[in-house]
Amino acid sequence: MAEAFTREDYVFMAQLNENAERYDEMVETMRKISGMEGELSDKERNLLSVAYKNVIGPRRAAWRIVSSIEAKEKGRQKPNAKRIEQIRVYRQKIEKELSDICNDILKLLQEQFVPRSTNADAKVFYYKMQGDYYRYLAEYSSGEDKEKIAGSALNAYNSAFEISQQLPPTHPIRLGLALNFSVFYYEILASPDRACELARKAFDAAITDLDKLTEESYKDSTLIMQLLRDNLNLWVTDSAGDDNAEEK
């Protein structure tokens, strides 16, 4: 009989899934780890994030492309009703996949990861992740549904933001939260002033503390700081908001 997998075996398997770029399998592997006792380690948390980010990312990109094609088709002088219906059905198929992925990780976060977390960086990580996946749901929602989902995202981001003040301004998790929270304000709540204020404060605080950066987090922190600055430049020059902001 085959020997049962240990936690270390599943971590190795998740890394193998990642190297092979088989992210659907990586999600399944991480779900097995999530069913085990105890908190996730920093390494396991990052693997969880990578797994879900890489199954949701291509579908978010696909939705944007299909939605753009749909808008162009509807904008023609003589729209083709059959083509528009084909596109609509396909877009809804992608939306169903997006919803399934988001609801899956949100359930894990709510029922397992958030309640188990005991330290500040883990709590910020999970609340940020909650905010992110509610934001992804809000991207293709409308009306009252969008308002409700955006409210859930805002609550999660606010919880993360409050706890993040316990972390150094240069901490990659705190910076990553500021980056994605500001994107939420800009793209979902259409609040460019609030987005710029949040991003600028996070960037300025990190600059002031730059000399305290550890070698271990230097690369991650400075990369996110660059993304914050890129977004600020984009948002100041692009009042129309057509371009997609950088996120972590």
UniProtKB/Swiss-Prot annotation:
This is 14-3-3 protein. Homodimer. Homodimerizes via N-terminal domains. Oligomerizes forming homotrimers, homotetramers and protein filaments. Oligomerization is hindered by polyglycylation in vivo. Interacts with a large number of both cytosolic and membrane proteins in trophozoites and encysting parasites. Interacts with a serine/threonine protein kinase GL50803_112076 (gCDC7). Component of a multiprotein complex containing gCDC7 and GL50803_94117 (gDBF4), a regulatory subunit of gCDC7, during both the trophozoite and encysting stages of the parasite. It comes from Giardia intestinalis (strain ATCC 50803 / WB clone C6) (Giardia lamblia). Adapter protein implicated in the regulation of a large spectrum of both general and specialized signaling pathways. Binds to a large number of partners, usually by recognition of a phosphoserine or phosphothreonine motif. Binding generally results in the modulation of the activity of the binding partner. The record marks 53, 60 as: Interaction with phosphoserine. The keyword Cytoplasm applies. O-phospho-L-serine binds at residues 135-136. It is found in: Cytoplasm; Cytoplasm, Cytoskeleton; Nucleus; Cell projection, Cilium, Flagellum. Changing residue 247 to A: No effect on polyglycylation.
